[in-house]
Amino acid sequence: MLVLSRKANESIKIDSNIEISILEIKKDSVKIAIKAPANIKILRSEIYDIIKEENKKSILQDKNNIHKIKNLFDYLSK
């Protein structure tokens, strides 16, 4: 992990197409701006974690549904 210090109105470049700018620094928060191509997904970590959990739930539900369909198919095949 790279750790950098930046002041307000300074920025960080990642590759040639991503720029992270420090807009404002307050007592307990930092306001940042991120410029990146539209195909780069940028999410707050708490939103990412929620999406990840919902995807896990969906996969488990799909597995349950597949199992139910298989059981029904087995029953109907008799």
UniProtKB/Swiss-Prot annotation:
Entry keyword Coiled coil: no
Cellular component GO terms, alphabetical: cytosol
UniProtKB keywords: Bacterial flagellum biogenesis, Cytoplasm, Repressor, RNA-binding, Translation regulation
GO MF term set: mRNA 5'-UTR binding
A GO BP entry: regulation of bacterial-type flagellum assembly
Subcellular localization(s) per the UniProt record: Cytoplasm
Family, per entry: Belongs to the CsrA/RsmA family.
Role this protein plays: A translational regulator that binds mRNA to regulate translation initiation and/or mRNA stability. Usually binds in the 5'-UTR at or near the Shine-Dalgarno sequence preventing ribosome-binding, thus repressing translation. Its main target seems to be the major flagellin gene, while its function is anatagonized by FliW.
NCBIfam families: csrA (TIGR00202), PRK01712.1 (NF002469)
Protein name according to UniProt: Translational regulator CsrA
Organism: Borrelia turicatae (strain 91E135)
